[in-house]
Amino acid sequence: MSTIRPVFYVSDGTGITAETIGHSLLTQFSGFNFVTDRMSFIDDAEKARDAAMRVRAAGERYQVRPVVVNSCVDPQLSMILAESGALMLDVFAPFIEPLERELNAPRHSRVGRAHGMVDFETYHRRINAMNFALSHDDGIALNYDEADVILVAVSRAGKTPTCIYLALHYGIRAANYPLTDEDLENERLPPRLRNYRSKLFGLTIDPERLQQIRQERRANSRYSAAETCRREVAIAERMFQMERIPSLSTTNTSIEEISSKVLSTLGLQREMF
């Protein structure tokens, strides 16, 4: 039996919703080589027929039934896509009818509402948070009074991508502070962070994984040496424990999970954009 399986994320909008849900589903299955493709803005019958042809062709190529994760809100488009012979996983269908019964109201099919511009206030909060994250990345700026959270970690432990995710998806003003050699030698919380204890969250990482990441950045250097990575991680973890700073290992944790843990631990209540 072939382990290759073509998977299509099909949407009449950006496709972000279909891909996010589809990816979460696929991670529950191991031993398969999922060949994925996103088809966005399939918003009329002609585009749907073209998409169905692509899906059908992939099935013939790999000699297996394709999977379509579909977030098109128009039932007619979904019917055309189903003509491809693929396994259809409709993102909305299982929930619409129960919601209509519960709310005693019919749905109004609207394309792209999940990821459209909600309002200018939300938009500006998102942009301002992103600008804040970039200007406070890796200790560039140290004025943390306006920060919602300050991520603390050794270099290359996942601070920057987590800050950007928090800014883009939650409008969180996230700064990050890299632990320097001087900080690690003292093994105490850096003085510039002491007034912001309630905003601190530590990130740690497996030393071997850290070495792999640093080798890509600066190979065969003291910075990427195994001993350096082991020492820095060990000191950082002791510091977090001694200073009672909540922390999380990023080694086998997705950015989404890290961000969710940061928000819940620090009690930051924000809706996802």
Swiss-Prot record:
Enzyme Commission number(s): 2.7.11.33, 2.7.4.28
Binding residues annotated for ADP, in chain numbering: 153-160
InterPro entries listed in its UniProt record: Kinase-pyrophosphorylase, PSRP
UniProt keyword list: Kinase, Nucleotide-binding, Serine/threonine-protein kinase, Transferase
GO function term, MF aspect, one: ADP binding
Catalytic activity as recorded in UniProt: [pyruvate, water dikinase] + ADP = [pyruvate, water dikinase]-phosphate + AMP + H(+); [pyruvate, water dikinase]-phosphate + phosphate + H(+) = [pyruvate, water dikinase] + diphosphate
A matching Pfam family: Kinase-PPPase
Similarity section: Belongs to the pyruvate, phosphate/water dikinase regulatory protein family. PSRP subfamily.
Function summary: Bifunctional serine/threonine kinase and phosphorylase involved in the regulation of the phosphoenolpyruvate synthase (PEPS) by catalyzing its phosphorylation/dephosphorylation.
PANTHER family (UniProt xref): PYRUVATE, PHOSPHATE DIKINASE REGULATORY PROTEIN 1, CHLOROPLASTIC
Protein name as it appears in the record: Putative phosphoenolpyruvate synthase regulatory protein
